[in-house]
Amino acid sequence: LPAIAIGMEPADRDLLNQPPRDPKEGILSFPFAGKILFQGFLIGAATMWAWEMGYSQGGEAIASTMAFSTLTLARLFHGFNCRGRKSLLSLGIGSNLWCVMALFVGVVLMCAVLFVPQLQDVFAAGDLTGSQLLAVVLGALAPTAVIQIYKMMSAGTA
């Protein structure tokens, strides 16, 4: 869902003021690939942290559910990171309502997996406590927070 929403992103007003990219440089440049790897590492680390926390608190079912939920939410939040080079504070969270709707629909679907008994059975989802759900949300938000802080610092808007 976030990928479709990003496709609906309004064009950057400063796009024509930027110098053209080097035609000899591939689409996947070294700096861009580095950003992708770093962002993937952050999401992966948050997911592994959630799994470890869940395993220590309730075994494999809780660990898997926390990891699944953290990864799902982190990817939904990451859609906002992929909107452009500017931070969310510069772009405005609501400037692309498709991204907000994608987040909402994704959260509703994830909650269905976590709280609808039939879907819990299909996905082998464990019952999470309130503190575990809070940990999932905070863990999923952490990569986006780091990426947004980096964007603000690199743009000089922090």
For each feature predicted by the language model, list its residue ranges.
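C-terminal transmembrane helices and immediately adjacent loops/tails
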Residues: 1-158
